[in-house]
Amino acid sequence: MRRILSAVAIVAVTAGIAACGSSSSSSPGSGSGSAAAASCSNSGIQPELFQKGQLTVATDKPVYPPWFENNNPANGQGYESAVASAIAKQLGFKPSQVKWAYEPFNASYAPGPKKFDFDINEISYTPQRATAVTFSSSYYDVQQALVALKNGPISAKHTPADLKAYIYGDQVGTTSLAFITSEIQPTAQPKVFQTLNDVKSALQTHQIDALVTDTPTAQYISSSEIPGTEMVAQFPSTGEHYGLLLAKGNPLVTCVNKAIATLKSDGTLQQLQKKYLQTYLSVPTIQP
């Protein structure tokens, strides 16, 4: 649910995706230091870990489908849980060596040291966030989508011009909130809430006309969470993508990027998207 990426930033991220070797680049997704020069095996990355002998992976709570299943990030079910498990395996960790930790979404990209190796929580790369933390290369390319009450005015009238007249709400600090302001540009300022659950409650109680979030989440909300709602449509891609979040300058990112590149080239990410996300993605797109 998390932000717009400029064409310049896309180039910067692409340039930062490197094999597991040394690098002097400071662009997002690049790495330097001992991990960049060392082997990306389990033993080679031990000096870079938050706790030696284990991979510490963070996310928020509660967690939701299709990204996680049964509110249990450690079970390997759901797209992000499965991706984290696959990356851990690429880095040489057994399931018993992976520890999940709690990190609130808004705290994850704040400056300062981190009590995890990486965070996976539908966190979009943005240049602003990248001043405080380091992002991996993309593990999922994002489109935003619109959720509204069924048979409301938005269902019938949702051209870009129509959308400016409605009242929106979203979670503080999210790229979905930024998307409302920068892309939809409604006449009224969107309402801001502390959690996604608060946003969903506002929709149910008619405090807002619609919310915006990533397409799989929007489809899940409308099909399984809030009766009487629908995903109206998704918006065209802006280049937004989700990356793993690491402490600023953490050289482990180079080996994480190598793992992601392997999962892309061998078809694993595509298979996981088909398994967990495909049913959520066949939706119409709002045309400019």
Regions found by a protein language model. Give the residues of each.
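Acidic, polar ligand-binding/catalytic clefts
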Residues: S85, S96-P160
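Periplasmic-binding protein-like
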Residues: K61, D141-A148, T215-A261, T279-P288
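Extended ligand-binding regions for polar small-molecule ligands
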Residues: G21, S81, Q90, G152, ...
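Extracytoplasmic small-molecule ligand-binding "clamshell" domains
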Residues: A37-D119
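Bacterial lipoprotein signal-peptidase II cleavage site
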Residues: A19-S32
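Ligand-binding clefts/hinges and TM-proximal coupling segments of bilobed small-molecule sensing domains
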Residues: S22, A36, C40, G44-P47, ...
